[in-house]
């Protein structure tokens, strides 16, 4: 972005498109505002645009996703996407169509290759499975930052008080992934 004299920006949805399509909740790793904050503070991106995923978004032709949303609305001049990025109605847009569109319309385009750690592809699905299994440290390694969760503290059975370790029972925000039931060491 600096080389082009532009501000860096990231685009994300307020929820997983899979949730809207299937009607089944997909647990989020963060709230949209937490995600935007992580992208800004930990990855140095200047702007983060969070767009609602709805029926209009779901049925938008892939060409319109680029031309109307990314270029016209957000003034994109260079697009960066992951190797498995799919977009537009019925996921008809893919990285090859993105590259082709960008080349034909004078836009820059970079595709980020698959990222692996310890022989495993880094993906939100895998990270969710680690968190659901209670493997928070390993999930944090795949995230590239410590996993954090916010929620409401509620009264429990006083087990922590009896064992001399102060504990807090946390109810995560709605739609946020629930960790495996257990006791976790944290920092406030």
What are the functions of these language-model segments?
Residues 56, 63-67, 71-188:
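Active-site cores that bind ATP or allylic diphosphates and position pyrophosphate for catalysis
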Residues 1-72:
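Core alpha/beta nucleotide-donor-binding catalytic domains of modification enzymes
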